[in-house]
Amino acid sequence: MTETAQAPLDPRLLSVLVCPVTKGPLIYDREAGELISRQAGLAFPIRDGIPIMLPDEARPLDV
């Protein structure tokens, strides 16, 4: 599986994950394969179905 072809993220997993920076909610962007934290302005990648919740691995959102 590549970063651009993501399997659906389990809704149960999404319900327990929070942004590691703000502890706020995340939004799943299936097309981009990312979990978005609007509060932190960061997009966390999902690689091979595994969310990478490290702030150093996140990309800043365009303002």
Swiss-Prot record:
GO cellular component, one term: cytosol
InterPro entries: Trm112-like (IPR005651)
Highest taxon, organism lineage: Bacteria
Gene3D superfamilies per record: 2.20.25.10
Family assignment from sequence similarity: Belongs to the UPF0434 family.
The protein's name in its UniProt record: UPF0434 protein GDI0182/Gdia_2252
